[in-house]
Amino acid sequence: MKKLKINYLFIGILTLLLAAALWPSIPWFGKADNRIAAIQSRGELRVSTIESPLTYARINGKKYGLDYELAQQFASYLGVKLKITVRQNISQLFDDLDNGNADLLAAGLVYNSERVKNYQPGPTYYSVSQQLVYRVGQYRPRTLATVNESQLSIAPGHVVVNDLQALKETKFPDLSWKVDDKKGTAALLSEVISGNLDYTIADSVAISLFQRVHPELAVALDVTDEQPVTWFSQLDDDNTLSAALLDFFNTINEDGSLARMEEKYLGHGDDFDYVDTRTFLRAVDGVLPDLQPLFEKYAQEIDWRLLAAISYQESHWDPLATSPTGVRGLMMLTKNTAQSLGLTDRTDAEQSISGGVRYIQDMMGKVPETVPEEERIWFALAAYNMGYAHMLDARALTVKTRGNPDSWADVKQRLPLLSQKQYYSKLTYGYARGHEAYAYVENIRKYQISLVGYLQEKEKQAAEAIKLAQDYPAVSPAEFDTETFPFSSFLSQPSSNYLSHSPSLPFSLKKKDEN
């Protein structure tokens, strides 16, 4: 997947270019007969979306997602409440606009020439490519020339239909596909993963998130180049909503909150490793259940799944792990660190985890208060890996190179420079393996995403299995077997660790109260 990047320059230029055109309607708060006035009179911003880990998800009453956070901030900016409506596919989203049931569509929708003929786009905030996917171990098509409708299904309203039609007319006359009116993109990706469908097409971000939980999903080829993602509203002569959106995006671009959200949701999607992800998920099944009670016991304000991800990065959950430099145990503590924490046996799982948490908390306490709460953990983990003094150097270097020392996105880009003489020779604490600290934190974030997503899916499967069992009360649990009922062995565990904690936002250190 190509590097995802918010189009800050585009937002700035578009704001300047359109401000003049929209100027008559910019004082939207003072008029009573425009779209913004209607939203404020109603007291709510109506946003339609599609449920996905990136756009919007609701787990046990907690909401998260890039589009959800942006929409929540925009509603607050307008002084109204946010009303979210979830639809199953893209066609239903645009139906909401056509029928006047939504003010905005915020669902990772791609900007294209056909859509803007009928709908008003907002600023673009990241970009994706459309990719053809297949299951690892199955035939990988290298071209669309021989792909047909018996193999390829896509979701209704998918933007790629126009691209496929153009390719059919210009390059691949035998290309054909089926639009599945009953399934959205996420459902079709699941069909490919299960082997019930050969191919589907999805955007690169959705695919990268699915791969963290389903490494068997593979990209066959890019169908399109990078395409900008935007929100959509109704197209008419009332430009007040467009003007408000432009002003809002310009504001969050300038104050840095847009960059923080990019880092939070899009800053760790590159460099998928099939073998590493598969190995990790196998360890989740085979090793984690024995260690989970300890992670939960000592995690305190740290999400236990984040703590588990840290430990896996350190030792692959091997209590006896030892490095050539002498660090040992689940949290790979040095002898001096262990002694300072009062530990007597670094290879004892409980001592190692409790000591590692205290050491991380010590690093957290040193991170300047100017660093946003949800990013403090990444600074602390980098310091945990390479030493806090070198983190100070990284922040100083970020300032010298005109970055924001309180932004993890900015600081992490400078970490590899700490091993280059032209930079470390001018820093207070000298040489550091900053590239290792960079990889260390990025790997932890990827493991955390995989773990949270995997456990969420396990919980969903278990809930579906329980519901199915309730629908057939005459059949006793003993009559189920793993061939005919694949989740029976999972359900037979009376107190599965996988279900002992409800899933929540995987991208933050602490859960936030819902507004």
UniProtKB/Swiss-Prot annotation:
It is an enzyme of class 4 (lyase). Residues 493-515 are annotated as: Disordered. It comes from the Bacteria. Residues 270-515 are annotated as: LT domain. SUPFAM superfamilies: Lysozyme-like, Periplasmic binding protein-like II. Keywords: Cell outer membrane, Cell wall biogenesis/degradation, Lyase, Membrane, Signal. GO terms for biological process: cell wall macromolecule catabolic process; cell wall organization; peptidoglycan catabolic process. SMART domains: PBPb. The active site is at 314. Transmembrane segments: none annotated. It is a peripheral membrane protein. In the N-terminal section; belongs to the bacterial solute-binding protein 3 family. This is Membrane-bound lytic murein transglycosylase F. It comes from Citrobacter koseri (strain ATCC BAA-895 / CDC 4225-83 / SGSC4696).
